[in-house]
């Protein structure tokens, strides 16, 4: 985010850089974003290929992302930990992606996709919350 003025103090979770003209930029450095989500989408692609269905990745992403909009706001209770690698913003040295749910959660494709989309921007939100306070 290009800043109108310098931050009031230094934040461990925010990297400061500048634009070519020297304007200050605050950047949340996330190690994990869509890598885990992309892995799941590639799994759906592989399934389509096994069925002999032509794969257009733009269509696969579009259909799955739009379908996520029909899921529950709370993702039906499903939880995704998308850490392929460590994440300094949240204090994790190593990554171990996981998808978890309880027997009573609303396990649907829409909720599955929604929770992975939320997870892909979760760390970015933590950093942005610092900037917008």
Where are these regions (language model features)?
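Active-site core segments that coordinate phosphate-bearing ligands/cofactors
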Residues: 1-133
């Amino acid at each position: 985010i290009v800043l109108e003025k310098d931050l009031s103090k230094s934040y461990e979770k925010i990297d400061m850089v500048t634009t070519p003209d020297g304007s200050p930029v605050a950047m949340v450095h996330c190690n994990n974003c869509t890598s885990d989500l992309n892995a799941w989408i590639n799994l759906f692609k592989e399934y389509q290929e096994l069925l002999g269905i032509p794969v257009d990745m733009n269509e696969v992403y579009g259909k799955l992302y739009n379908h996520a909009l029909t899921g529950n706001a709370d993702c039906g209770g499903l939880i995704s930990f998308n850490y392929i690698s460590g994440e300094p913003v949240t204090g994790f040295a190593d990554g171990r992606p996981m998808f978890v749910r309880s027997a009573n959660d609303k396990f649907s494709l829409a909720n599955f996709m929604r929770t992975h989309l939320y997870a892909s921007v979760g760390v970015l939100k933590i950093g942005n919350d610092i900037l917008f306070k």
